[in-house]
């Protein structure tokens, strides 16, 4: 979770969400 939050802040929420959400839905 902490790693994910760091990635969100680094790359921008919208961009990262589009990449992470599909993984979470697997």
UniProtKB/Swiss-Prot annotation:
Residues involved in ATP binding: 11-16
Keywords: ATP-binding, Cytoplasm, Helicase, Hydrolase, mRNA processing, mRNA transport, Nucleotide-binding, RNA-binding, Translation regulation, Transport
Cellular compartments per GO CC: P-body
EC number(s) from the headed UniProt entry: 3.6.4.13
GO-annotated molecular function: ATP binding; ATP hydrolysis activity; RNA binding; RNA helicase activity
Record domain Helicase ATP-binding: where: 11-26
Top EC group: hydrolase
Subcellular location, record wording: Cytoplasm, P-body
UniProt catalytic activity: ATP + H2O = ADP + phosphate + H(+)
Any GO BP annotation: regulation of translation
Motif (Q motif): 1-10
Family of this protein: Belongs to the DEAD box helicase family. DDX6/DHH1 subfamily.
Its job: ATP-dependent RNA helicase involved in mRNA turnover, and more specifically in mRNA decapping.
This protein's domain notes: The Q motif is unique to and characteristic of the DEAD box family of RNA helicases and controls ATP binding and hydrolysis.
Protein's UniProt name: DEAD-box ATP-dependent RNA helicase 1
Annotated source species: Catharanthus roseus (Madagascar periwinkle)
């Amino acid at each position: 979770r902490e790693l994910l939050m760091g990635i969100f802040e680094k790359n921008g929420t919208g961009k990262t969400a589009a990449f992470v959400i599909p993984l979470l839905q697997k």
